[in-house]
Amino acid sequence: MDTERSSEICGNVPDVTLSTPKGKVFSTPKGAHKRTPYSGHTKVNSSFKSPVQTSSTSPAKPEEEIEELKKRRAKLDSEIALLEKDGIRVDELEQHIDLLHEYNDIKDIGQSLVGRIAALRGVTTRDLYGQFGLELDD
């Protein structure tokens, strides 16, 4: 990096001289990121371990995947048939699911409001539940 570009990035900050673990000296603008001090540990370049979990099995072939999806669909169809046999309609289930979603949204908003009121009053939400006559399981 040339001096002109260095001052452009770091402003008019004086340079600082640093040294590496092997005694090599180099300079860097003051305030620039410095390297982690040398720990003396010899295995610096160990193999990288990804935090992403990978399956030990190889990816399924498209034909196998299609068969698995067909089995799953057949199982779901049989469950729907059993529910219909018990007198429950699919559209009724969809309505119940929609109502549960609406209930959960309203409950989340209510809990958020109780939390804000508790923060303003400097008390816990547990205290407010008691004041409002609510059960902690609500």
From Swiss-Prot:
Alphabetical list of InterPro entries matching this protein: DNA-repair_Swi5
Flavoprotein among keywords: no
Coiled-coil region: 60-87
Record-linked Pfam families: Swi5
An example Gene Ontology biological process: double-strand break repair via homologous recombination
The keyword Cell cycle appears for this protein: no
Subcellular location: Nucleus
Keywords recorded for this protein, A-Z: Coiled coil, DNA damage, DNA repair, Nucleus
Annotated region (Disordered), positions in chain: 21-66
Chief localisation class: nucleus
This protein's GO CC annotations: nucleus; Swi5-Sfr1 complex; Swi5-Swi2 complex
Polar residues: compositionally biased ranges: 42-59
UniProt cross-references to PANTHER family, sorted A to Z: DNA REPAIR PROTEIN SWI5 HOMOLOG
Function recorded in the entry: Component of the swi5-sfr1 complex, a complex required for double-strand break repair via homologous recombination.
Quaternary assembly: Component of the swi5-sfr1 complex.
Recorded family membership: Belongs to the SWI5/SAE3 family.
Protein's name according to its UniProt entry: DNA repair protein SWI5 homolog
Organism: Salmo salar
Gene transcribed to yield this protein: swi5
